[in-house]
Structure formats: C-alpha cells, structure tokens
Amino acid sequence: MEKSVCIRTDDFFHYLKKGAIPPHFPESNAQNGVVIEAFSEAAKRFSRGGYDVYVDGIVGPWFLEPWLGAARKGYEVHYMVLRASREITLRRAVERSKLDLKTNTELVEIMWEQFCDLGKYEANVIDTTAQTVSETVQSIKAHLKSGQNRIK
C-alpha cells in the first residue's frame, strides 16, 4: 500500500449544520442516506486517485446500496463488521463517549441489537470480544488478503 486514506463516517455527520437531525433519530433516515452516499462518493474518488480507502464507521447492511453499486462498477469493496459481545461493546463505548452515560448506553444498546444478527452478512463479522487493537488489525488484514468479505 503506497497511498491510503481513512474516511471516518462521523466526520461527514459533523459537516451537517443547519437542519441537521441527530443520526440516531428515526426521522433522520433520508439525511443519513445522503451522508452515506457522500462518503461513498468520496471513497470512490480517492480510489480512482490511486488510494487504498478504509471507511471507519457504522454502516449497517440497510445502507450498503451505494457500496454494492460501487462493487458492480468494478471497485474493490470489502465489508467487515467489527463486533464484540454486548457487555464489551457497552464498556468500550462508554469509555470513549462524548454523550452522557444514559444516552450513550441507550444508543449503543440499540445499535448492538441492530448488528447482533446481520443475516446474510453474518459471515462479514469479526468477533473482537477477546482481541486487542493489534489483534483486530491483524484480523482485518487477514480478511482483506483472503478476500472473504469482498462484496460483488
């Protein structure tokens, strides 16, 4: 990898100003779709520029259409979900949250439920419950090398 870029999806949500709806509210679905399309387009542009692109953020299967479209157009797209047990997920999230404890706990529990059974994408899950950050990085590299999480 000679050139790479990491796109943090949260950054794109922070670009929203006037009229922004918190992304966890049900009425934010259309806004969230626009944001996902925006960072998908940014990823494709960097890829065309010769960069390996890593998208770091919460992207559920319900928002994969832009990525499936990119894969159909020949972009190499890998979809991996890093998931720990509920208990570990809550502990990790609370340690790094900018929200109050109650709100953060509620949001993480909702998201964990959304990601605890991904149906046909369950094979794309990397269980990070017992992994260190370094071990998780190695798991991601192994999955990329094998191509097992490449979507077409």
Regions flagged by a language model, labelled:
Residues 30-78:
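Glycine-rich phosphate-binding loop used to anchor ATP phosphates in small-molecule kinases
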Residues 32-40, 83, 109-112, 137:
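Amphipathic alpha-helical transducer elements in NTP-driven molecular machines
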Residues 47, 144-149:
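Short, hydrophobic alpha-helical segments
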Residues 1-44:
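Conserved substrate/cofactor phosphate-moiety recognition/catalytic segment
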Residues 11-13, 83-88, 131-132:
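Conserved nucleotide-binding/hydrolysis micro-motifs of P-loop NTPases
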Residues 43, 140, 144:
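Hydrophobic "lid"/C-terminal helical patch
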Residues 73-93, 126:
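Conserved phosphate-donor/acceptor-positioning beta-strand/loop module used by diverse small-molecule
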Residues 95-139, 148-152:
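Small-molecule kinase domains that catalyze NTP-dependent phosphoryl transfer to phosphate-bearing small molecules
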